[in-house]
């Protein structure tokens, strides 16, 4: 019984622009595209979670970032085609701790299909430092297949297409500065100022500070605002330093001197 083998084409995952096709690799963002050798997984249990190397033979030491453009999973059932049951295969990024967010893609296949194949496009980069730690895993869960423990009912073959590069930030300040043809200082400063002003984070912080300042001013006014006696509670007579309105500037108080010191008599 032969296992289905598939050699993916780069064009299946990546569409090169006319500029990228003409220009040398050093002048384009695309540095190299490598097709790694296959990684074979044999499922021994009904549920398996194992690491998978999607970057075999990819030159990670020469670059800073690597992206998985696509991966082709080919499965071959090692049981008769009339057997009931199926399998669920999930590709996982084990760096993410949230079980709902770590799943990159999921595929289901019935045992009666005998062989199956699916393509996964993660479409994101990781640093080569993380890539060397093999951040990807495959979770295989066989369902409703009546087979004793210890046997191998399924074989998986994975072939991936990877892209490596030294720069992944394409819309940052670095790209704008490099694009300046005239080495004029004013032109450089203009690009920097325009970029900083356009960043949403700076605007968000500025707006937050303004809102916070207004809220604090309202709190100061309401703190010392006069309230009628009917709203007074049992704790309103507890003198606290923050509840006492203090005046540090002396104020003149008029005194009526007529009648001062004279005894009060009833007419």
From Swiss-Prot:
An annotated GO BP: transport of virus in host, cell to cell
Keywords: Host cell junction, Host cytoplasm, Host cytoskeleton, RNA-binding, Transport, Viral movement protein
Cellular localisation: Host cytoplasm, Host cytoskeleton; Host cell junction, Host plasmodesma
GO MF term set: RNA binding
Disulfide bridge partners, by residue number: none
Primary location group: host cell
GO annotation, cellular component aspect: host cell cytoplasm; host cell plasmodesma; host cytoskeleton
Physiological role: Transports viral genome to neighboring plant cells directly through plasmosdesmata, without any budding. The movement protein allows efficient cell to cell propagation, by bypassing the host cell wall barrier. Forms a ribonucleoprotein complex with viral RNA. Binds microtubules and modulates microtubule stability. Can bind double-stranded DNA.
Family affiliation: Belongs to the tobamovirus movement protein family.
Protein's UniProt name: Movement protein
């Amino acid at each position: 019984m032969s296992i289905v083998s598939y050699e993916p084409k780069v064009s299946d995952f990546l569409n090169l622009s006319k500029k990228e096709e003409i220009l040398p690799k050093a002048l384009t963002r695309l540095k190299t595209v490598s097709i790694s050798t296959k990684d074979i997984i044999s499922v021994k249990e009904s549920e398996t979670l194992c690491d998978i190397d999607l970057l075999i033979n990819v030159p990670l030491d020469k670059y800073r970032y690597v992206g998985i453009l696509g991966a082709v999973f080919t499965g071959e059932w090692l049981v008769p085609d009339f057997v009931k049951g199926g399998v669920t295969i999930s590709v996982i990024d084990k760096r993410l701790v949230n079980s709902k967010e770590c799943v990159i893609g999921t595929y289901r296949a019935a045992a009666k299909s005998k062989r199956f194949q699916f393509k996964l496009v993660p479409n994101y980069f990781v640093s080569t430092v993380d890539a060397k730690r093999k951040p990807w895993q495959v979770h295989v869960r066989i369902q409703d297949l009546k087979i004793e423990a210890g046997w191998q009912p399924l074989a998986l073959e994975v072939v991936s297409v990877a892209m490596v590069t030294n720069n992944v930030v394409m819309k940052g300040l670095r790209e704008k500065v490099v694009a300046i043809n005239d080495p004029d200082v004013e032109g450089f400063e203009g690009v920097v100022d325009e970029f900083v002003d356009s960043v949403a984070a700076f605007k968000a912080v500025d707006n937050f500070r303004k809102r916070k300042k207004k809220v604090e001013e309202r709190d100061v006014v309401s703190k010392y605002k006069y309230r009628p006696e009917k709203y007074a509670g049992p704790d309103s007579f507890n003198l606290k330093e923050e509840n006492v309105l203090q005046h540090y500037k002396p104020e003149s108080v008029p005194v009526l001197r007529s009648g001062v010191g004279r005894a009060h008599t009833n007419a």
